[in-house]
């Protein structure tokens, strides 16, 4: 049984640019700088296994897999050193990459590394194929049911899964959520939640990129085609940590129109990813799960290959048939560099706790806001989040029900986002994603209010 809180593809998988590649920007450098050489070798093997499985599954099911070259490029002279370092690491680990002087894009580039015959996929076609395979094998996909807890059943052989649609009993439970919804193991404190943006543009066919491209500089710039459209992506930031996410999307649009003049915006969206301090996913048994509860999380923006690789790892764990790369990743040693990254992220979390509370208590909360806007202020000493969306004003307690930070308004998605661990909520407080299992509560004495229609001014 697969239990989904909303519909399949409602969150990150349905909003990914779905590049299926063993060349992943500068990921090899990141992993090598924070892990042992054996861990990097195992990671490269895991990505090859994930790639091969997904390409094979798509070929059998017709899930819309398209072969494309993957290219990591430098947009500045300073970035070339990163390109060359990634090239050397990739070659030394068996990837048949080549070093280019120019990436062949409409803007200047200063070197690139290319890996042939990687792929891109339509994520919704992939999810439909996976759901079909699940049903063919006798499985059930339950949508619209949110898991709220996992505990011990009366039988020692089973776990009890609590959902909004009622309880389930299972011999084994896999938490395949973006971030674990159970706080055991404190994985929420080991992950960095990031949002990034993607846009689809209509451009002349001859202007479509001939591959999948990812820059090494910040802000990130990602490119691929999607049938007759250009997809651009990037401008990521910590969840709830940018004053105006709308501005982040607008900056991406400005950049696209600078280099593709006349491009017509067709659609735009954002997605959420979770990064581990060492770059390698967390996968295996969940602490205090009695050996029945497993997790897979922290795909660090490469979920197409990492999602499959962690699934293969869990299969090996459950069946007792682990491969050498799976065992090597389980035995991964945390180096000081990765510890430092984790400490830095948690210091940032602490800073955002203080900042979010100070900002909320600095001024009174409004009774209502303009359409499409949200604002946090105080009512008494309680932080209160007020928003008006589609003519309805909601007043909520602004304290995130997960760990108590104060949420911030996301003016791109029209949501309340927590800057601590990435929980997100709809304007009415309904939990959308992240580690929070409960929705935000209504502010004391408040109720949902349809906004009064504005009267036209009388003509003198």
Predicted regions and their residues:
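Glycine-rich FAD pyrophosphate-binding loop
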Residues: 1-15
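General small-molecule cofactor/ligand-binding pocket signal
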Residues: 66, 98-100, 140-142, 266-268
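Helical element adjacent to the flavin cofactor pocket in flavoenzyme catalytic cores
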Residues: 81, 87-93, 112-172, 176
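Flavin-dependent oxidoreductases
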Residues: 149-225
């Amino acid at each position: 049984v697969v239990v989904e809180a909303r519909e399949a593809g409602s969150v990150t998988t349905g909003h990914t640019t779905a590049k299926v590649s063993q060349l992943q920007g500068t990921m090899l450098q990141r992993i090598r700088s924070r892990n042992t050489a054996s861990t990097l070798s195992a990671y490269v093997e895991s990505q090859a296994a994930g790639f091969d499985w997904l390409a094979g599954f798509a070929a059998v099911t017709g899930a819309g897999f398209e072969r494309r070259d993957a290219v990591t490029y430098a947009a500045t002279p300073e970035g070339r050193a990163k390109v060359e370092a990634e090239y050397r690491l990739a070659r030394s680990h068996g990837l048949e990459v080549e070093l280019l002087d120019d990436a062949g894009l409409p803007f200047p580039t200063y070197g690139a590394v290319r890996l042939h015959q990687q792929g891109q996929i339509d994520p919704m076609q992939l999810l439909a194929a996976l759901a079909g395979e699940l049903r063919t094998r006798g499985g059930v996909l339950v949508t619209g049911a949110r898991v709220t807890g996992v505990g011990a059943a009366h039988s020692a052989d089973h776990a009890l899964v609590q959902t909004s649609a009622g309880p389930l009993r299972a011999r084994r439970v896999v938490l395949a959520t973006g971030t674990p919804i159970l706080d055991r193991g404190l994985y929420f404190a080991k992950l960095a939640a990031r949002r990034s943006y993607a846009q689809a543009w209509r451009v002349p066919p001859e202007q479509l990129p001939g591959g999948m491209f990812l820059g090494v500089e910040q802000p990130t710039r990602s490119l691929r085609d999607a049938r007759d459209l250009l997809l651009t992506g990037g401008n990521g930031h910590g969840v709830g940590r940018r004053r105006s996410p709308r501005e982040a999307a607008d900056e991406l649009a400005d950049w696209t129109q600078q280099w593709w003049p006349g491009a017509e915006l067709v659609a735009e969206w954002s997605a959420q990813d979770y990064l581990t301090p060492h770059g390698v996913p967390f996968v295996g048994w969940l602490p205090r799960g009695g050996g029945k509860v497993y997790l897979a999380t922290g795909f660090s923006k490469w979920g197409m290959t990492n999602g499959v690789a962690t699934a293969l790892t869990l299969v090996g764990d459950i069946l007792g048939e682990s491969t050498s790369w799976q065992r090597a990743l389980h035995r991964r040693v945390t180096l000081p560099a990765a510890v430092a990254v984790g400490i830095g992220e948690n210091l940032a979390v602490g800073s955002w706790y203080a900042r979010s509370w100070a900002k909320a208590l600095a001024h009174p909360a409004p009774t209502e806001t303009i359409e499409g806007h949200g604002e946090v202020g105080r009512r008494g000493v309680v932080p209160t989040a007020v928003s008006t969306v589609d003519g309805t004003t909601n007043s909520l307690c602004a304290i995130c029900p997960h760990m108590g930070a104060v949420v911030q308004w996301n003016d791109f998605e029209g949501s309340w986002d927590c800057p601590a661990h990435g929980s997100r909520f709809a304007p009415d407080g309904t939990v959308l994603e992240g580690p929070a299992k409960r929705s935000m509560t209504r502010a004391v004495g408040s109720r949902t209010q349809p906004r009064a229609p504005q009267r036209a001014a009388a003509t003198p």
